[in-house]
Amino acid sequence: MAGGRSGSRELPETPTWAVAVVCAVLVLVSVAMEHGLHNLSHWFRRRQKKAMGDALDKIKAELMLLGFISLLLTVAQAPISKICIPKSAANILLPCKAGQDAIEEEAASDRRSLAGAGGGDYCSKFDGKVALMSAKSMHQLHIFIFVLAVFHVTYCVITMGLGRLKMKKWKKWESQTNSLEYQFAIDPSRFRFTHQTSFVKRHLGSFSSTPGLRWIVAFFRQFFGSVTKVDYLTMRQGFINAHLSQNSKFDFHKYIKRSLEDDFKVVVGISLPLWFVGILVLFLDIHGLGTLIWISFVPLIIVLLVGTKLEMVIMQMAQEIQDRATVIQGAPVVEPSNKYFWFNRPDWVLFFIHLTLFHNAFQMAHFVWTMATPGLKKCFHENIWLSIVEVIVGISLQVLCSYITFPLYALVTQMGSNMKKTIFEEQTMKALMNWRKKAMEKKKVRDADAFLAQMSVDFATPASSRSASPVHLLQDHRARSDDPPSPITVASPPAPEEDIYPVPAAAASRQLLDDPPDRRWMASSSADIADSDFSFSAQR
């Protein structure tokens, strides 16, 4: 066998043990990954994290889509490499500062490598023609798509983790709502001036009241104390007043966590518009434009703008409280409305966050791919310092979006006109099942009590036995024959007898049994519903 072909043996020239070992490793790794995802999905279901289970299903769908793309690239590699285009068309819109000689040298190198592998360059047979994409470039593109999917899922998981970490201290604020101090603060009999409340003083200070400076204050506030205790408690009270009863025991913190999980299953996916954004960035990556440099700052601008807008929403709610009344009763109450958000659409904020995460993952995946692929580092990183700045901006953007903007979004967007009813579906079903179970248990107890009461009535007042008693026979017995006859008179009806054995318990039981059972069951059921505690399950 020739020495030049020793490193490029085909399958018939490869030992069977080598083929078996490689196949076994690939199969075992794939099965382990599939089994791990399956167990993770079951763990989410057991922990009653339906939204996280849906997010995991979305990740599985992304992996399946990635598998389809990989399959298409593998199958279409040979046909695409046979699509020939003129060299003049191949020399425009290049991403690198490479001249015609460098391109031809690289093409010649590709032809030599393909020829050494036992193949040949189909388009080299034609004068002035080159392949649309060579087999090597398609292989590199294949790797980039895989790296992009991995980075996007990783960034979304990091975003969820940092967001939950930021929201941990909100749980302490939620627990304080059961304290006497908080109940005194929201006491309806307590009157205060609106401008003296902590919420209004925080958001309507000297600089916050100036129209031109409000946006500047909101911009810097997102970095320093984006959400405070007074903000959380005020928006919590406004949400409860708008969508629930004021005295309901509602865990607003758990609701926000479930809402964040529900949004996570949207963020973790790569929709068709996002794929088009990625394709557009690849198209605009032309040498001389510096597309990958200046476009890396676009997600940063979007995140800063979104954070500023969310802070402005809080300021607008504080302004409406002050404009509505001079004196407030109890706690200041905000009125949720979609008018605070862009185009009356709170979900647009989530779209911008989704776009930011995808674009940031795209930038980092492109950096890692070009640095790790031989021959691409010199092309895409001519100025290494600009590339380092790009990486620093990407990492800072990820921390800012995950730890500040995403939790702020989860809280402020609850001030929209509508609440997420999909989150309540599971909780409503649980509440109805618990209510049904308690109602059936109480009905069994009532039936047993009614049966015992009926039995006590039967034993305490036996009408048939009393009518056959000798005492009653003696009352109706006629006078003896030796007694003097008495004048015939019309007998008056006997006075009603008093029972010598009064049974007040039996009378009470008789009064209880006089009520229709349906009315008694409905009254008890209505009381159960009114006293029920509609709160989220503590099992997390």
Swiss-Prot record:
Subcellular location: Membrane
Listed GO MF terms: calmodulin binding
Membrane topology listed for this record: Multi-pass membrane protein
Keywords: Calmodulin-binding, Membrane, Pathogenesis-related protein, Plant defense, Transmembrane, Transmembrane helix
Keyword Ligase among record annotations: no
Region entry Disordered, spans: 468-526
GO cellular component, one term: membrane
Transmembrane segments: 17-37, 61-81, 143-163, 266-286, 288-308, 348-368, 384-404
Side of membrane Cytoplasmic, spans: 38-60, 164-265, 309-347, 405-540
Extracellular compartment spans: 1-16, 82-142, 287, 369-383
KW Membrane (keyword) present: yes
Residue ranges, compositional bias (Basic and acidic residues): 474-483, 512-521
Region (Calmodulin-binding): 426-447
Disulfide bridge positions per record: none
Organism domain of life: Eukaryota
GO terms, biological process: defense response
Function: May be involved in modulation of pathogen defense and leaf cell death. Activity seems to be regulated by Ca(2+)-dependent calmodulin binding and seems not to require heterotrimeric G proteins.
Entry domain remark: The C-terminus contains a calmodulin-binding domain, which binds calmodulin in a calcium-dependent fashion.
Membership in a protein family: Belongs to the MLO family.
Protein name in the entry: MLO protein homolog 1
Gene designation: MLO1
